[in-house]
Amino acid sequence: MNFARDVVDAADPSALALVERARDGRRREWRFAEVAEGAARLAGWMRARGVGRGDVVMTLVGNRPEWVMAMVACFRLGAVVLPCPEQLRPTDLARSVGVVSPTLVLADPRNRATLEAAALGCPVAYVDESGLFDGPDVAEAVTLRPLDPCLLTFTSGTAGEPKAVLHGQRYLAGQAVQAEHWLAPARGDLVWCTAASGWSKSARNVFIAPWLRGAAALLHDARFDPAARLELVERERVAVLCMAPTEYRVIAARVPLRAAPALRGLVSAGEALNPEVLRIWQQATGLPIRDGYGQTETGQLTGMPAGGEIRPGSMGRALPGTRLWIEDGELVADPATVPTFFLGYLGADGGGEAPGGPWRTGDRVREDADGFLFFEGRTDDVIISAGYRIGPFEVESALVEHPAVAEAAVVAAPDAERGSVVRAVVVLRSGFTGTPELARELQEHTKAATAPYKYPRVVEWADELPKTASGKVRRAVLRDSG
């Protein structure tokens, strides 16, 4: 198997693969012939610089065709690609490099300052350099096995540092299940998954799942703007729109909704959508938002099927062939039935093969009499904000680096638009006073220390943190007091 050969090279060369809407307003259509050639020449360029099967290539590129071709070039060589979101800070990037030891970093030139500050100690190439996509060498696609490594993505990190999740080649082919039964584009459709490059959902739904169904992908390399989002859906005649729950919430709250002429499917994943948002979208567009569920380690496990019964608030049923059950309130999966299940973790702290036996998701889920599943919350303390999964440990670590902070605990606080936001309860060192000015200073400090979406939007002061007898912070008490 090889995704580059079996899907990209095998497609009709003249068929539409990508519609590019660049940050500067440019628009360009890319045919499969152009994508295949650009990826093959980039693969040749990388091979000449020592990249081969099993080597890790990190990308730090926005939602641009160059990112897609870099991914396909890695698939072509059998290299392992680690797409990173552009929001990462130098400390995030340095930590990732320390875990995965990339042979090469491919980056957007707009991220040059961040990469230079990270001082990664490995070769970095920028996608605007001459010869990357139009060089003389064309690499042939190697033959790969389902369990050969393919893709790396990082978890959010709940009890410690984020873990590097390693997927095999089967992860790519395995997307056919959710592509058919949940995303569900038709051949020739235009699909827009708005997730930024580097996130788990973007790796599978921006272009992999659409191409498996014979559809094209829209790439929009710009910040989220509610009005612009709807205008672009109409102008580009998007057929299937895949957005984060927060994006659906914000658009419903800030922009008058209307039906789009070509739009036939709305899907969402990452966290539950409240009934009022679902009602507003369906009333305005005539379309239900079909929810789905998955994890970094598992890929997608459930989905509300296209054309089937819709249960508001449900994340659907298990995808065909996937065996799920609930044990003591927690959703559990049989890895043998999950074609996109991961191979294991990388790194000294989380290294090793994927655990054998049932996979405990750590999510509390209930099931109704008809098998529809409803997400109730995490069994651990992960915060889901605007679709981002944020581990409290990382935010707490950033806060306690500030000279004013003695201790800090981070929990979720409810928010009408983002679902939840990060709430920090801070114990100050002697000589410091909790003021609005200090709260803003801690927020800016956290933004500088880690990815900006992780900063605490709510900062509160406490004389001490509630703890167990063994000294562990009782976050449940903090959540209940918020």
What are the roles of these predicted feature ranges?
Residues 13-16, 137-154, 161, 184-190:
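Conserved pre-ATP/AMP-binding loop-to-beta segment of ANL
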Residues 238-243, 252-310, 323:
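Gly/Ser/Thr-rich phosphate-binding loop
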Residues 18-64, 68-72, 89-94, 98, ...:
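Conserved AMP-binding/adenylate-forming core of the ANL superfamily
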Residues 88, 105, 241, 364-454, ...:
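AMP-binding/adenylate-forming catalytic core of the ANL superfamily
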Residues 7, 48-49, 72, 76-134, ...:
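Structural core segment of the AMP-binding/adenylate-forming
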Residues 317-321, 328-355, 390:
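Conserved ATP/PPi-binding loop(s) of AMP-dependent carboxylate-activating enzymes
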